[in-house]
A protein has these predicted regions:
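Short, charged, intrinsically disordered terminal tails
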Residues: 2-13, 81-97
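A short hydrophobic beta-strand element
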Residues: 45-55
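A short, structured loop/turn motif at beta-sheet edges
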Residues: 42-47, 74-78
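Short, non-transmembrane alpha-helical segments in secretory-pathway proteins
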Residues: 8-40
Length: 97
């Protein structure tokens, strides 16, 4: 049981708050601002988010290098793990396998 909820249920965190939290915490660790959060999934233990980050800025912008990071957050929205899953140029289009 928690002191904030006498029934012992965990407080609900809104998806928008989790998205901001994932982006902010990853930016603090990497020293680079996120471009976007491209995916957010509720898990048994918390949340998983995919965050897109500009890694190398180039001109023209379509040649800039971005990376996709998978971020794992606990039930309170605190970052517990992150890993880079992909690097790509901004102009690259995803193609079906």
């Amino acid at each position: 049981m928690t002191s904030s909820d006498p029934a012992g249920r965990r407080p609900k965190i809104k998806a928008a708050s989790v998205m901001r939290s994932a982006a902010d915490q990853l930016a603090e660790l990497l020293g680079r601002p996120p471009e976007s959060v491209s995916a957010l999934t509720r898990t048994e233990d918390g949340w998983e988010a995919d965050v897109e980050v500009l890694e190398v800025e180039r001109i023209p912008d379509t040649t800039s290098v971005l990376a996709s990071y998978r971020v794992t957050l606990d039930e309170e929205g605190d970052l517990v793990e992150y890993r880079r899953t992909r690097r790509y140029t901004r102009g690259q289009i995803d193609r079906p396998n």
